[in-house]
Amino acid sequence: MCVSKKKLASKKIPTNNSSNNPLKNEIIENILENDFIKDITMEFNGISFPVYSEFERTYQQLFGDYKTKIRCQDYLFLIRHRKLYNGGLHKIQIANYIKNHFITRYDFDKISMTHLMCACIYSINDSNLELVKLLVNNFNFTKRDNTDHTALSYAFKNPGNIKIIGFLLNYIESDYFEIDQNIINDSLIYWSKTDYLPCIEMAKLLIKAEASINYKDRTGSTILINIINNKNYYNITDLVKFLLTEGVDIHESTTICPDNNVVKEKWTTSIGSKLIESVKFEINGEQIFPSYYGDYDESCRKPKYSIMNHLIKRYCWDNNKRIISMFYDYGYRELPNTTNTSILEFTKQIVNDIEFRESYFRKFKPDLIEKQREIVYKPGSVRSEIIKLNWEINSGQTLNPNKYIFDYFGINNLIELEKMINDV
């Protein structure tokens, strides 16, 4: 079949020209900022006055005075605008979609999700990086939805979004606004609860942004507990070692029982629950809304389980003693409360070895200090000769390096030198 050139031309996807970026023009910016009347002027006595001045726009961007721009939409962005977020559009198509649907940075849907949140939750391997850069502003960065999540936390939903996370964290530093530090802390919690093995480099970015490594969520869980209890991660040795080197609290107690399946409490589950909750049902003409999560039980708040309890539970299915031994390397000294004889013997041996080393150094510490001082300060020692030689070199004296070698080895003449060479 012969296809006309006109039809072929209509299917051709235009290339993105960096010098003429369709996402960087003034029309797109005005729509995103909800500045629909920016170019409208009023005339009074022959003088034109702009309705929306450039100064007013700058003021709103800096100080967050954007209440008149906020719009709540009575539908779900994840469903209505999924074509925008799923990574299937190139830049020109994104620009056209924003124009046609009047997408703004101040919109949120019926469960308080913003377009920035949706772009982050759909992104895989930074597929929505350009869209995130386009959508972010002070309002939708700090905005929380009905599940108490932010756009930054949703960037951890799928793997590989390290550039998006880095960009969002840099946005905090580069822009003129303050945020609740718990936005960063909560994101570190979500990092530790993903279905895929968490990326250490992402955690480093959050810690650099002053995320607390010992932060607890509302259930009393920490990033260390989440990682230990997640059976999606088979080998967590490197993750645990990283947290230990960063100073995670290994003596922390928690209300979370090791027998609980923490993996069932995925942080992304709440999104689906809210989506279902937003759907109305009618029974006998009466509207019924499906119930959301059960409230967290506040009656049992006293911590009674140690991190070691969780490690022992994990050992029952992965047989990894190395993580347990690392805890003792970083200062843990208590024996675990378990009936597992293999673990008891293993940890007793570690504790006994540590106590022996510590007792040895306590006993011989004075002698070791004396030997150290002798090596450093005793006249005639190698170190003292090096210090002496360094002093003479820096003082400008004429030196004969061979003389120091001969003196040190007791070589007084040529015969003794030849004898030593022959012996070697």
From Swiss-Prot:
<feature type="repeat" description="ANK 2">
    <location>
        <begin position="147"/>
        <end position="177"/>
    </location>
</feature>
<keyword id="KW-0677">Repeat</keyword>
<protein>
    <recommendedName>
        <fullName>Putative ankyrin repeat protein R858</fullName>
    </recommendedName>
</protein>
<keyword id="KW-0040">ANK repeat</keyword>
<dbReference type="Pfam" id="PF12796">
    <property type="entry name" value="Ank_2"/>
</dbReference>
<feature type="repeat" description="ANK 1">
    <location>
        <begin position="115"/>
        <end position="144"/>
    </location>
</feature>
<dbReference type="InterPro" id="IPR002110">
    <property type="entry name" value="Ankyrin_rpt"/>
</dbReference>
<feature type="repeat" description="ANK 4">
    <location>
        <begin position="219"/>
        <end position="252"/>
    </location>
</feature>
<dbReference type="InterPro" id="IPR036770">
    <property type="entry name" value="Ankyrin_rpt-contain_sf"/>
</dbReference>
<feature type="repeat" description="ANK 3">
    <location>
        <begin position="184"/>
        <end position="215"/>
    </location>
</feature>
